[in-house]
């Protein structure tokens, strides 16, 4: 595990909304400050864990964007962002997304049948976003080679595997206990 990622998670602020404790971290929220050293470290570790013999990297708007940008620059693999608004482009695929805190639509563009892809996102908690991405990519006829999230918080990995058959790789597993992030693995 990355020492930078681990230390930054252990010291990140926790905000309580209702009964849920949110951890506020540069990788998952873009605040308080995204240090280039942390982003470089995370993207380097991602590259070592994913299949790089792919045509495209796919992420959902918004916080996967800095990570896929760094990975794309380092690997020369182009990326696609599933957006929260439609563009009405030919072949656009809408898919419903439900997470633990929101519902909405995501829209997939730029994927062709047979494209080999890696899915990359910042955090997995409920698995709702990844299930939506996988479903959209299957509808597009993409060949999903890897699924990776930087931070695992919750039961989302199991949900994704049960609903889609895909295993989700992660860099670190955490939980929030007594107002602090605990590193589990």
From Swiss-Prot:
It is found in: Cytoplasm. Disulfide bonds: none annotated. It holds the Pfam family Pribosyltran. Pathway: Purine metabolism; IMP biosynthesis via salvage pathway; IMP from hypoxanthine: step 1/1. It comes from the Archaea. GO terms for biological process: IMP salvage; purine ribonucleoside salvage. The keyword Transmembrane does not apply. Its main location: cytoplasm. InterPro entries: HGPRTase-like, PRibTrfase_dom, PRTase-like, Pur/Pyrimidine_PRTase. It is an enzyme of class 2 (transferase). NCBIfam families: HPT_Archaea, PRK02304.1-4. Homodimer. Belongs to the purine/pyrimidine phosphoribosyltransferase family. Archaeal HPRT subfamily. Catalyzes a salvage reaction resulting in the formation of IMP that is energically less costly than de novo synthesis. This is Hypoxanthine/guanine phosphoribosyltransferase.
């Amino acid at each position: 595990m990355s020492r930078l990622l681990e230390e930054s998670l252990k010291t990140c602020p926790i905000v309580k909304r209702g009964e849920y404790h949110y951890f506020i971290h540069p990788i998952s929220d873009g605040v308080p400050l995204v240090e280039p050293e942390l982003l470089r470290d995370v993207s380097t570790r991602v590259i070592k864990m994913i299949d790089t013999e792919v045509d495209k990297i796919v992420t959902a708007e918004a916080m996967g964007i800095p990570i896929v940008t760094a990975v794309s620059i380092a690997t020369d693999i182009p990326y696609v962002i599933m957006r929260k608004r439609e563009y009405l482009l030919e072949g656009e695929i809408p898919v419903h997304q439900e997470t633990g805190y929101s519902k909405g639509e995501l829209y997939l563009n730029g994927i062709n049948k047979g494209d080999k892809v890696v899915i990359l996102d910042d955090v997995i908690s409920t698995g709702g976003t990844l299930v939506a991405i996988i479903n959209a990519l299957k509808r597009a006829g993409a060949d999903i080679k890897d699924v990776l999230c930087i931070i695992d918080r919750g039961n989302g990995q199991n949900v994704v595997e049960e609903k889609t058959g895909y295993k989700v790789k992660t860099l670190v597993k955490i939980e929030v206990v007594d107002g602090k992030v605990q590193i589990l693995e």
